[in-house]
């Protein structure tokens, strides 16, 4: 627990192990960008067209009127804030540096992949459906946390699956293509906490990376910090009220043979305010074979990616070292070559 950032006194200066060279943390453009906002209560034809257009252009978009109630969203945000303010002793049993442990509290302070560490603490939970007895493996404090997590994850999962159906309709493939093993793995919940940082210009909450799953929904919280790679620059994201920020994972890129891209993004820190966000990852099962769908292949458009078992992809992804660009995956095709 001594590595947990939020459990230690506020730092007056940034420890050397967290300092990145300036060329590794290029500043974002000054403009703050509002990602495309898609109202899921609009007509279905309009919604699926908007999702596909936004996905092709930026790989990121926002959804509103998505079906997750404002109360559920506020309850989740409130519970997460309370969790990170609990005394260290109440969280000690959750702390683990074992990456393969499904439910754990960990810190970027223990990651030394590229020589530097990351200014983030994270509570990661595996959420199978139906939840059943798995709920007993989640934290039970603050009181009511388990029920809030179950309700939030169930509703967010439903939104993710509906977005996948809309994408299928927009691309002209079978609407239930992503049902079953492709989206049937445990939903992974990352509750990220970025404490206030004494020198945010030289630190990273998370390095540039692409998500390894199918599709991700982010509850971004009240403090901005997400930045997205776009046309060679980093753009700051200004989330809309009560919206989820959505991005495509690498498995969606593989299935669509590159039609939809998984885009690099990073998390920055703030000198005055702590930031808490909640990422919901829709995952394939570990045994799922994932490759380009035949609907996206032709003589003129051969497969760009191999068909691999998701378990093998995850195994290689977890050991890929950071390159000079700080891209955790370096290149999706290169990761596949190692399998």
Curated annotation (Swiss-Prot):
Record-level Gene Ontology MF annotations: 2'-deoxymugineic-acid 2'-dioxygenase activity; L-ascorbic acid binding; metal ion binding
Record GO cellular component, one term: cytoplasm
Record keywords: Cytoplasm, Dioxygenase, Iron, Metal-binding, Oxidoreductase, Vitamin C
Protein name: 2'-deoxymugineic-acid 2'-dioxygenase
Positions with a binding annotation for 2-oxoglutarate: 275
Family per record: Belongs to the iron/ascorbate-dependent oxidoreductase family.
One Pfam family linked to the record: DIOX_N
Effect of residue 11 to P: In strain: cv. Ehimehadaka No.1
UniProt-listed InterPro entries: DIOX_N, IPNS-like_FE2OG_OXY, IPNS-like_sf, Oxoglu/Fe-dep_dioxygenase_dom, Plant_2OG-oxidoreductases
Listed transmembrane segments: none
Free-text function comment from the UniProt entry: Involved in the biosynthesis of mugineic acid family of phytosiderophores. Hydroxylates the C-2' positions of 2'-deoxymugineic acid (DMA) and 3-epihydroxymugineic acid (epiHDMA). May be involved in boron tolerance.
Catalytic activity: 2'-deoxymugineate + 2-oxoglutarate + O2 = mugineate + succinate + CO2
Record's signal peptide: none
């Amino acid at each position: 627990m001594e590595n947990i950032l939020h459990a230690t006194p506020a730092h007056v200066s940034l420890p050397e192990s967290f300092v990145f060279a300036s060329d590794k943390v290029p500043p974002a453009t000054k403009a703050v960008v509002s990602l495309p906002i898609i109202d899921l209560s609009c007509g279905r034809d309009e919604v699926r067209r908007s999702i596909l257009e936004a996905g092709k252009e930026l790989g990121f978009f926002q959804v509103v009127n998505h079906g997750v109630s404002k109360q559920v969203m506020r309850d989740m945000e409130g519970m997460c804030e309370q969790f990170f303010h609990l005394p260290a002793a109440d969280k000690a049993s959750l702390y683990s540096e074992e990456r393969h442990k499904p439910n754990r509290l960990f810190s970027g302070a223990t990651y030394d992949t590229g020589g530097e560490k990351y200014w983030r603490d994270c509570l990661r939970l595996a959420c199978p459906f139906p939840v059943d007895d798995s709920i007993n493996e989640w934290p039970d404090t603050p009181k009511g946390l388990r029920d809030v997590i179950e309700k939030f994850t169930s509703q967010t999962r439903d939104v993710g699956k509906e977005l996948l159906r809309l994408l299928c309709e927009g691309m002209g493939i079978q609407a239930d293509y992503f049902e079953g093993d492709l989206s049937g793995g445990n939903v992974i919940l990352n509750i990220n906490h970025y404490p206030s940082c004494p020198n945010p210009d030289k630190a990273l909450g998370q390095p540039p990376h692409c998500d390894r799953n199918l599709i991700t929904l982010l509850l971004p919280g009240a403090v901005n910090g997400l930045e997205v790679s776009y046309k060679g620059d980093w753009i700051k994201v200004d989330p809309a009220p009560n919206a989820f920020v959505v991005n495509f994972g690498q498995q969606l890129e593989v299935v669509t043979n590159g039609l939809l891209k998984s885009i690099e993004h990073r998390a920055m820190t703030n000198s005055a305010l702590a930031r808490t966000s909640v990422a919901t990852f829709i995952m394939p099962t570990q045994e799922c074979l994932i490759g380009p769908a035949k609907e996206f292949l032709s003589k003129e458009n051969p497969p760009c990616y191999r068909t691999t078992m998701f378990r093998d992809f995850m195994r290689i992804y977890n050991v890929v070292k950071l390159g000079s660009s700080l891209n955790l995956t370096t290149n999706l095709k290169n990761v596949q070559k190692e399998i």
